[in-house]
Regions:
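Long, low-complexity or tandemly repetitive, helically biased scaffold regions used
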Residues: 9-11, 18-52, 56-184, 194-204
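Long, low-complexity intrinsically disordered regions
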Residues: 1-11
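Non-Sec secretion/translocation targeting segments of pathogen effectors
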Residues: 1, 205-208
Length: 208
């Protein structure tokens, strides 16, 4: 009896910063597309894709809070990084919740055009859940990762406002709430990569 050949190993996930850049580029393309006039069906699909993206970013960001820097102790994650990233994840999920019940999530509809910017954005955000499962890298890569997420958040906030143009009144209110929530997420992300201030030290000789 011959043995079956072993399945090829799965490719390693992309580096967190590479994944974050791909999401940022997809968010920019989607925001540009959603700023154009669209049919009611396309508008519903765009809002659903925004919902799915926010949900998956929230899930992925919770895992990014466990980022481990490679190298030696002189290259640590910034002080308070896990807490600020976790707070940003809560903001993403809260903005997602603000759309829950207003429109059913259809962001990964199998019949959607795979080349549509919103569909590509959904897949990019979904990929982060795997890519950031056990995140590690240098502190420079961490800084790039977070800055790319900040850019993504900015694009999504602009997209939410664009989508209010053709939205019914109730949905428009919720989309504006998304914009506010993403502004809060940006604040948390920027705090996550700020260089901590100097530690409080005992005064040296001759100081008061």
């Amino acid at each position: 009896m011959t043995s079956q050949p072993a399945a090829p190993p799965l490719p390693p996930p992309l580096r967190p910063d590479v994944t974050a850049q791909a999401i940022s580029q997809a968010a920019q393309a989607a925001a540009s597309a959603w700023a154009q006039p669209m049919s009611p069906a396309a508008h519903r699909r765009a809002v659903s894709q925004l919902y799915s993206t926010l949900r998956d970013l929230g899930i992925a960001a919770r895992r990014l809070a466990d980022y481990q820097t490679a190298g030696h102790p002189s290259d640590p994650t910034p002080l308070g990084f896990p807490q600020h990233i976790a707070a940003s994840a809560r903001c993403f999920l809260a903005t997602c919740d603000s759309l829950d019940g207003v429109l059913a999530p259809e962001g990964l509809d199998p019949v959607a055009d795979p080349t549509e910017p919103g569909t590509e954005l959904c897949h990019a955000a979904r990929s982060a859940i795997v890519a950031w499962r056990q995140p590690y890298g240098t502190s420079a890569e961490l800084d790039t990762t977070v800055r790319q997420i900040v850019a993504t958040t900015s694009f999504l906030a602009a997209a939410a406002l664009s989508l209010t143009t053709y939205a019914p009144r109730r949905l428009a209110i919720h989309l504006r709430a998304v914009h506010v929530g993403l502004t809060k997420a940006t604040d948390c992300l920027m705090k996550a990569i700020q260089v901590p201030g100097p530690a409080h030290e005992a005064p040296g000789p001759g100081t008061s």
